[in-house]
Design a protein with these regions (language model features):
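Active-site helix of classical SDR
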Residues: 145, 185, 193
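Short, small/polar-rich loop/turn modules that mediate ligand/substrate recognition or access, typified
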Residues: 201, 206, 267-269
């Protein structure tokens, strides 16, 4: 896959939460492969080790090493700056964001991707589980955005724009069985995105979200392994999406990169579906 703007993020800096695997890692690699300096924030970043707050590993600022391929398969580890933080821990989030801003000299793009799943009906989970999921999926975005906004404002003042991209879900726009808590959290992200876009549009900070369908990520793989028949469950998830397959992490990353790009300068308050047609298509059954 090629891009008409291979260096569209040159000179820009980005922070990707939940960046150690799946959609977050694919996004970080793609942004770096197109010229950005990228920090990944996660609770654990195995490739770099370390357990404390702030910067971990051997990231060399300004010394990015790119691999081949559109999604940087690399970039190599050295091109991504790891910062360790739990998005439910406000002091840790503030410290991690400050570390990235200090290392890069600013911040142009925030990708709020960190999140966890939940299964069951409205009766299935107790109050503690509801609080836990909302704390990560919704309040986590609030914490990282709040910590990053001063740097994003400075970037917008200097360059004319900055960007926040949130990861919502098709669960925010379509009713899925056994996903009440997860859907509530992702629906909140959808609404949060619109409200943030309205609040910050006059500061030239664009706020958008992606709404992925079921993606082929390590998290989904773990869910499948817990199913009584993992192969049958995978086929059911594929069949639920009109294109007949799972969404790839790289496809979601490409959508995030578009929304974060300076070339999307007039795009704000938008939810971009990457769901194989799941939210919008109503197909007839295939001929027997």
């Amino acid at each position: 896959m090629s891009t008409p703007h291979p260096d569209e993020f040159s000179g820009l800096t980005a922070l990707v939460t939940g960046g150690a695997s799946g959609i977050g890692l694919a996004t970080a690699r793609l942004l770096a492969s197109r010229g950005a300096q990228v920090a990944i924030l996660d609770r654990e970043i195995p490739a770099h080790g370390g357990t404390g707050g702030g910067v971990q590993g051997d990231y060399p600022p300004g010394n990015s090493h790119q691999g081949s391929g559109p999604f940087g398969s690399g970039p190599l580890d050295g091109s991504l700056m790891p910062v360790i933080a739990d998005v439910t821990d406000d002091p840790a989030v503030r410290s991690a964001v400050a570390a990235a801003v200090e290392a890069f000299g600013g911040l142009d793009i925030l990708v709020n991707n960190a999140g966890i799943g939940a299964a069951g009906t409205v009766e299935s989970n107790d109050d503690a589980e509801w609080r836990r999921v909302m704390d990560v999926n919704v309040l986590g975005i609030m914490r990282t955005s709040r910590a990053a906004l001063p740097a994003l404002r400075a970037a917008a003042s200097k360059r004319g724009q900055a960007a926040i991209v949130n990861t919502s879900s098709v669960a925010a726009t379509a009713g899925l069985p056994q996903r009440v808590l997860y859907s509530a959290s992702k629906g909140a992200i959808y609404s949060l995105t619109l409200a943030m876009a309205a609040d910050h549009v006059r500061e030239n900070i664009r706020v958008n979200c992606v709404t992925p369908g079921t993606a082929d990520t390590p998290w989904v793989a773990r869910l499948l392994q817990a199913a009584p028949d993992p192969d049958a469950e995978r086929e059911a998830l594929k069949a639920r999406q009109p294109m007949g397959r799972l969404v790839s992490a790289e496809e979601v990353a490409a959508a995030i990169a578009y929304l974060a790009s300076p070339y999307a300068g007039s795009v704000t308050g938008t939810a971009l579906a990457v769901d194989g047609g799941m939210s919008g298509l109503r197909l007839r059954p295939p001929p027997s």
